Every structure is written in structure tokens, then in C-alpha cells.
Amino acid sequence: MKIAITITVLMLSICCSSASSDICPGFLQVLEALLLGSESNYEAALKPFNPASDLQNAGTQLKRLVDTLPQETRINIVKLTEKILTSPLCEQDLRV
């Protein structure tokens, strides 16, 4: 459960920051592959970004951790992400 919370908080900070008014479609593909795809799908989604080997390894470790979550939880994280991204709140600067 801690992994799911960590991923959700990470996605919120990236997706709703004032610097991300337009979200990179490639990022969303990587995120979807991370949560719902196979390890090879995830690695293929990362490939266009040409990550250094240490970054690639860290991403693969994260993918393996995410894969330990129940499928329903991963699907619900995707639904939560979609809800957040389509929310009018993402158009506002929510920082205190």
C-alpha cells in the first residue's frame, strides 16, 4: 500500500505542478506501462527517452515493485490519475 501511495503522490506532484500545464504524452505512456504493462512494455516506453543505465535500472526496480500490487489497485491508480488530470483543480496553482 505504501508503494501505491508513493506513486500517487509522485504523479500528483508532477501532473499538477504549475510547470506541467501540458503533460508529455510519452510520460503518460510510460506511466500506463508502469502500472498496467509488462516489464518489456515498460522498457519499450522508456527507450525513446534514452535513460542512462542507472536510471533504467531504477525504473525496472520500480516496475517490479509496482507489479506486486494487486491488478485492481493498479487499475484504480490509473483511474485516479485520469480523474486528477481532468479535474479543474489541475488548472490552478495549489501550492500554499
Curated annotation (Swiss-Prot):
One of its GO terms (molecular function) is phospholipase A2 inhibitor activity. Residues 1-19 form the signal peptide. This is Uteroglobin. SMART domains: UTG (SM00096). Belongs to the secretoglobin family. One of its GO terms (cellular component) is extracellular space. Keywords: Disulfide bond, Phospholipase A2 inhibitor, Secreted, Signal. Induction: By glucocorticoids. The lineage of its organism: Eukaryota, Metazoa, Chordata, Craniata, Vertebrata. It comes from Rattus norvegicus (Rat). Coiled coil: none annotated. The gene is Scgb1a1. Antiparallel homodimer; disulfide-linked. Interaction with LMBR1L is controversial. SUPFAM superfamilies: Uteroglobin-like. Club cells (nonciliated cells of the surface epithelium of the pulmonary airways). Its main location: secreted. Pfam families: Uteroglobin. It is found in: Secreted. Binds phosphatidylcholine, phosphatidylinositol, polychlorinated biphenyls (PCB) and weakly progesterone, potent inhibitor of phospholipase A2. GO terms for biological process: negative regulation of interleukin-13 production; negative regulation of interleukin-4 production; negative regulation of interleukin-5 production; negative regulation of T cell proliferation; negative regulation of transcription by RNA polymerase II; negative regulation of type II interferon production; regulation of inflammatory response; regulation of mRNA stability.
